[in-house]
Amino acid sequence: MGIGLIMRLLDFSYADPCRNLALDEVLLEMVASGAAPDTLRFWESPAVFVVIGSSQRVQLEAHESNCLRDGVPILRRCSAGGAVLQGPGSLNFALALSYEHFPETASLHASYDFILGRVTAALCDLGMQVERQGISDLAIGGMKCSGNAQRRKRNACLHHGTLLYGVEPGLMGRYLTEPEDRPDYLGVRGHDEFVQAVAVAPARLREAIRRAFCPAALPETVSSAEEADVERLALDKYNSRDWNYRR
């Protein structure tokens, strides 16, 4: 169920990392409250930054000294999951879905099966040999190409994932520590040894995922109410040291 419903498509990126994170959270709140339809958003940060999961600690996930030296922000997102390096070459997709319209997403594991099943099929249709690894990763030949995470509410969820298509080699190892909690398939390999970009242009990635979830949708714009909420959250939360270093 779900596919074929009228969904909203947003292909919109802010220059500011805090606003990009804030908009994903705002979309969840708007869908959960019934103020906005189920939404698929694409975005890509023009600036490099580190984003950690909601329950992680900066000191364990990022090389703070390197980030500080290079002016790379370290931010905390609203969802669970592991640390990610954002920036050019990392395409993000975010789905804010109500359980009423997408009952397949009403439980955690079922939602990953549903969403990543469709993403995997869409990427395979582009000629890639993508397979699911662990709960929330996608890989090609044992090399990770996509990480995913969720935030869940009573009646809706936010699922967001990355698709790497051109990240500069060496940056992950410079800014991210090696994760202690990792899927078995990664073994003891470092970031630069287990992460691989997909050899597909970002426009084709966008189109494939759009067809998988909202084939009839045309790009829309962020509403004025959402813009106001983004500004508030970006300032009060995502730009706050209390939030980003809360653990």
Q: Which residues does each PLM region occupy?
A:
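Broad gene-expression machinery/nucleic-acid interaction feature
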Residues: 49, 90-92, 135, 144, ...
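Contiguous, small/hydrophobic- and glycine-enriched helical/loop subdomains that border
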Residues: 88-136
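Long, positively charged amphipathic alpha-helical accessory segments at protein N-termini or as interdomain linkers
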Residues: 111-130, 146-247
